[in-house]
Design a protein with these regions (language model features):
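Short acidic/glycine-enriched loop/turn segments that link adjacent beta-strands
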Residues: 12, 88-89, 120-124
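Residue-level detector of anion-binding/catalytic polar loops
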Residues: 112
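Short hydrophobic/aromatic beta-strand micro-patches
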Residues: 19, 93-95, 129-131
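PLP-dependent enzyme catalytic core of the Aspartate aminotransferase-like
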Residues: 105-109, 118-147
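Hydrophobic residues at beta-strand termini and immediately following loops
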Residues: 1, 84, 128
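PLP-dependent aminotransferase class I/II
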Residues: 1-77
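Short secondary-structure capping/turn micro-motifs that flank functional sites
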Residues: 44, 66, 91, 122-123
Length: 147
């Protein structure tokens, strides 16, 4: 089971792919309603599965993974950051010495981050998305401004 949502820019379509043994897939297919996926969503998935589109998506995913690792290392080196959790997604969980000031600095730069401070054991934690290079630069700038 694999999502097409985030990595393939189809978040609104709510699509995924399921691969498996034909016998298992047959059992699952029997449980599906007659038209389980809207036609526009199917068209988007079919367009995505074209070789050229898959190649572009793979390049973008690789670039995002590289930016994520670089961003994690950069943030972890800043004095205002206590911890950056390992991530397999397109976001990072970052524990800050002053999360409120970091959030304000991000807002001033047109960036939204999610405050996780109210969650148990996550005091001072923000979830930051790995954006495009310009967004990533503004994010680092916001963290550095608070440090």
């Amino acid at each position: 089971l694999r999502t097409l949502s985030k990595g393939y820019a189809l978040a609104g379509a709510r699509l995924g792919v399921l691969c498996g043994a034909p016998e298992l897939l047959g059992l699952l297919r029997a449980l599906l309603p007659p038209y389980p996926v809207p036609t526009p969503s199917l068209a988007a998935a079919e367009a995505l599965l074209e070789p050229a589109a898959l190649a572009r998506a793979r390049l973008e995913i690789a670039a995002t993974l590289t930016r994520r690792e670089t961003l994690a290392e950069t943030l972890d080196s800043l004095p205002g950051v206590r911890r950056v959790w390992p991530s397999e997604a397109n976001f990072l969980l970052v524990q800050c010495r002053n999360a409120e000031r970091v959030m304000e600095a991000c807002r001033e730069r047109g960036l939204l981050v999610r405050d996780f401070s109210r969650q148990p054991a996550l005091e001072g934690c923000l979830r930051v998305t790995v954006g495009d290079p310009a967004e990533t630069e503004r994010l680092v700038d916001a963290f550095e401004a608070v440090a």
